[in-house]
Amino acid sequence: MWVLFTAPCPTPDGRTARDLYEKRLTWIDDAMRESARELGCTFHRAWAAVDGSAFYALAHWRTREGAREFFERWEIDAEPGEEAIVLEGDVGLVPLGGD
């Protein structure tokens, strides 16, 4: 299951895309990474739009239940104004990992 997270910026509470991105530089640690792997996360990356208009993250989870358990375990709530979009399909030029 691929999930695209997007938060228009500035958020309703005034945070910028860069603020949301930089929060994750210290928040995501080895324990969180290991927990995500154990619960079925196979990919996660986050970005701030260059123009500052939004924050984006993309994640792949083996199951919806694993994703839900991860967010509950780590008490992760949506950023103000954030939307999570579940994506279907998988077509493109190069598969994940370039294989």
Task: Name each model feature, range by range.
Residues 1-55, 60-73, 86-99:
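Short S/T/G/P-rich N-terminal loop/turn motif that feeds into the first structured element of a domain
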